[in-house]
Every structure is written in structure tokens, then in C-alpha cells.
């Protein structure tokens, strides 16, 4: 049986708007196993981003806990959560957020350098990832010189540069045409399987969702299977 990498246990997340308290996550339970790619398919406004941010330790649960690699993270200090997030969690968004003044290679090197990896090793790792994503020849190009699909491939490579345990993606193909989206999805899926990541992918694309290991949605603040 595959190892459980991340688990949400009875997670609650509330926001206060004026006199009202909005409950976004209400006792949410969810887990991801190593090498598993799960689609999160839910309408806008139901809490997809909140779920991703809570799972990725960007937001702290109001109740319940997030267990990452066997470690309870919900009540850790901000510094401890930041360190775990940098080491163990990768994020990909609909818009790539690549640094425009740096090349594709340098963008992928950046998180490794921040972690303290020597520049030569970071460059070698970045080049390997670009080759794996089939855009090695574009290593010296800046984001503005890349197509939308190429930009997202660089963003995915950057997200996994530090070999995280978990990849969380919020509409990673939402800004791409269907053909390009399919190519990017295939590259992402191959990377997940090859590296043994656990991946949660929020998407409105039902065709891509059907190609993942399983699908879940959000209903009344809970994670339920589709």
C-alpha cells in the first residue's frame, strides 16, 4: 500500500466579513498518497484555493490539523511552517509568476539557491528538469520569449526543483488552449509518477480530471469523492 504523504484531519477554516463569520472548510478530511494525482473539481467560491493554501501551510487551520509526512503542522510556529513549506511543498498556479528578468534556467535555480544548494548543482538540476519537460533548448530564454505552454512547464519544473513531497496546483492549465493544456498535463503527470510526488490539482477541465487517479469536490465545506 502506498505511503500517505499528506492528510487533513477535521480541518476548519473560517473568515470574518463584518458581522458575519463565513465557514469555508467545515471538518474537511482528505489524504494523498505517494505517486497519486488527484483532481479537485468544484465551482468557484466553494473553497478550492482555501483548501490548497491550508494543505500547503500557507494558511493555518482554525481547527483540525494538517499532517505532512507524519508531522502535525497545524500548531507549529510560522518559521517552522515556512521551513517545511520550502522543503516539502511545491505550488503551481494558473499564471506562472516567473521572474521576468531571469532565464528559464535561472527561474528554476532560484528556489534551490534560496535553500542553499551550490550554484553548479542548482544549474545541473534545473537543466535536467528542463530536459525532462522537453524544453531544454529554451533554457536561456526569458519568460517573455516563451509560449504559454513553455512558461507553465518552467513553472512546474520550478515547483519541483527542491524535490518536494507534495505538489499543489491551482488551475495550472486554465490559461492554455486545449491542445497545449493536454501537453502540459501529460508532462505534469509524468513528473508526478517519476518523482513519487503526491499531487492535488484544482481544475475546471473535466477531461483532464478524468485522466487523474481519482476526483474529489467540495460540498458544504467537506471533501467528497466524485
Curated annotation (Swiss-Prot):
Hydrolase among keywords: no
EC number: 7.6.2.-
Keywords: ATP-binding, Cell inner membrane, Cell membrane, Membrane, Nucleotide-binding, Translocase, Transport
Record domain ABC transporter: where: 6-226
Gene Ontology molecular function: any one: transmembrane transporter activity
Sequence positions that bind ATP: 42-49
EC category: translocase
Keyword Kinase: no
Cellular location(s): Cell inner membrane
Membrane-topology annotation of the record: Peripheral membrane protein
Pfam families: ABC_tran
Function (record text): Part of the ABC transporter complex LolCDE involved in the translocation of mature outer membrane-directed lipoproteins, from the inner membrane to the periplasmic chaperone, LolA. Responsible for the formation of the LolA-lipoprotein complex in an ATP-dependent manner.
Family: Belongs to the ABC transporter superfamily. Lipoprotein translocase (TC 3.A.1.125) family.
Protein known as: Lipoprotein-releasing system ATP-binding protein LolD
Species for this entry: Mesorhizobium japonicum (strain LMG 29417 / CECT 9101 / MAFF 303099) (Mesorhizobium loti (strain MAFF 303099))
Amino acid at each position: 500500500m502506498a505511503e500517505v504523504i499528506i492528510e487533513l484531519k477535521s480541518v476548519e477554516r473560517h473568515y470574518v466579513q463584518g458581522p458575519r463569520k463565513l465557514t469555508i472548510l467545515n471538518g474537511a478530511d482528505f489524504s494523498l498518497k505517494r505517486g497519486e494525482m488527484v483532481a479537485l473539481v468544484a465551482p468557484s467560491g466553494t473553497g478550492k484555493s482555501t483548501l490548497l493554501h491550508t494543505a500547503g501551510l500557507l494558511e493555518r487551520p482554525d481547527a483540525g490539523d494538517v499532517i505532512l509526512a507524519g508531522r502535525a503542522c497545524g500548531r507549529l510556529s510560522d518559521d517552522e511552517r515556512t521551513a517545511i513549506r520550502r522543503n516539502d511543498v511545491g505550488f503551481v498556479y494558473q499564471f506562472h509568476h516567473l521572474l521576468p528578468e531571469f532565464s528559464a534556467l535561472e527561474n528554476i535555480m532560484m528556489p534551490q539557491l534560496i535553500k542553499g544548494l551550490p550554484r553548479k548543482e542548482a544549474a545541473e538540476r534545473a537543466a535536467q528538469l528542463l530536459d525532462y519537460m522537453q524544453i531544454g533548448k529554451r533554457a536561456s530564454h526569458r519568460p517573455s520569449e516563451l509560449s504559454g505552454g513553455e512558461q507553465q512547464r518552467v513553472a512546474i519544473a520550478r515547483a519541483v526543483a527542491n524535490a518536494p513531497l507534495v505538489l499543489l496546483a491551482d488551475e495550472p492549465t486554465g490559461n492554455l488552449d486545449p491542445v497545449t493544456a493536454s501537453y502540459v498535463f501529460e508532462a505534469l503527470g509524468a513528473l508526478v509518477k517519476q518523482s513519487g510526488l503526491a499531487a492535488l490539482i484544482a481544475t475546471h477541465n473535466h477531461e483532464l480530471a478524468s485522466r487523474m487517479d481519482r476526483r474529489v469536490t467540495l460540498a458544504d465545506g467537506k471533501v467528497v469523492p466524485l
